[in-house]
Design a protein with these regions (language model features):
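Bacterial N-terminal signal peptides
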Residues: 6-17
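Sec/Tat signal peptide C-region and signal peptidase I cleavage site
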Residues: 18-22
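A short glycine-rich, His/Asp/Glu-containing loop-to-beta-strand
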Residues: 27-64, 122
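Glycine- and acidic-residue-biased ligand/ion/polar-headgroup-sensing regions
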Residues: 67-86, 96
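Short acidic-glycine-tyrosine-enriched beta hairpin
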Residues: 86-103
Length: 136
């Protein structure tokens, strides 16, 4: 049996009016950027939602790390190259999004020599879970 969390109820109530409102002039209409199934979602009664921003100068990268829950990344400016252990690197451009899978070692780069990279990160986890686990 599926249980609705308070967060899912908020999203459901917001989305329920989209079709009607989208047809009326003067109302903004959301555009789907990413729709992806996933595993490793937190199951506890208390969850923490984090929305973070990050800016990378040309050539900067993240530490080698993993996450315990999926992480959604939306690219605002520049291009983000994601390297997941055992997989070919993937580059995500401005206006696109990706989901970083849980429990996979990874690093992310701004491979540009001249352009900055700006992104937004969405992370939902059990309350006490850290955002990332550095891999040494």
């Amino acid at each position: 049996m599926h249980r609705l969390t308070p967060l899912s109820l908020v999203f459901a109530s917001l989305l329920s009016g989209i079709p009607a409102a989208a047809q009326d002039p003067g109302f903004a209409r959301p555009n789907l950027v990413l729709k992806e199934g996933g595993t490793g979602m937190p199951r506890g009664d208390k969850q923490k939602v984090r929305v973070l921003t990050a800016s990378f100068k040309p050539g900067e990268r993240t530490v080698f790390h993993s996450h315990r829950s999926p992480v959604t990344v939306v690219i605002l400016e520049g291009a983000f190259t994601l390297e997941l252990e055992g997989r070919a690197p993937v580059t995500i451009a401005a206006g696109q999004a990706c989901v970083e899978p849980p429990n996979v070692k990874m690093t992310g780069y701004n491979r540009s020599a001249s352009e900055a990279l700006k992104l937004v990160i969405f992370y939902v986890s059990d309350h006490q879970t850290p955002f990332l686990d550095p891999v040494h």
